[in-house]
Amino acid sequence: MNRLLLVIDVQNDFINEHTKNTLTKIKELVDSNKYDLTAFTRFINDENSIWYKKLNYKGCITKEGQSIAIDTKNNKVFDKTVYTAVNDALKNYIRENNISEIYLCGFDTDACIQKTAIDLFEQNYDVYVLKDYCMSHAGKEIHDFYIDNLARLIGNDRII
């Protein structure tokens, strides 16, 4: 059985004063080869999305903004247009690679990390959130609140 490091949305448009230090830590974690497999997600936005139309969110529209901010080292990248990374492509990857544990890191704790962690947990995957390798571009206070919320929703032992 393999352990997967799933790096969520470490993209140029999510890098700011709140996330830049966490980005450095994530890069070091990816470079450590501590996990059997590493995969990345990339949020893709456009003018027809609900994010653009309903929230006036214009991030991750350009190729530069969508670009992953660290070297993916030719690991698998899953494109997504919603908060969660859980879709058929990811589930097939998990099954095909005999993955038993999934470790999440990346951005934003309050959105894509939370939604992905809950979705994996609800579908009975063994999921863990690496709290020191996640952050919200809205700041540490938001990050901490959602880490506490995730501990309540998926179990304190799954926040490491």
Across the structure, where does each feature detected by a protein language model lie?
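Short hydrophobic beta-strand that contains or immediately precedes a catalytic carboxylate
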Residues: 6-8
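A short alpha/beta connector and helix-capping loop motif
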Residues: 18-45
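Short active-site-proximal "capping" loops at secondary-structure junctions
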Residues: 12, 43-48
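Short acidic, Gly/Ser-rich segments with clustered Asp/Glu that frequently serve as metal-coordination loops
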Residues: 10-18
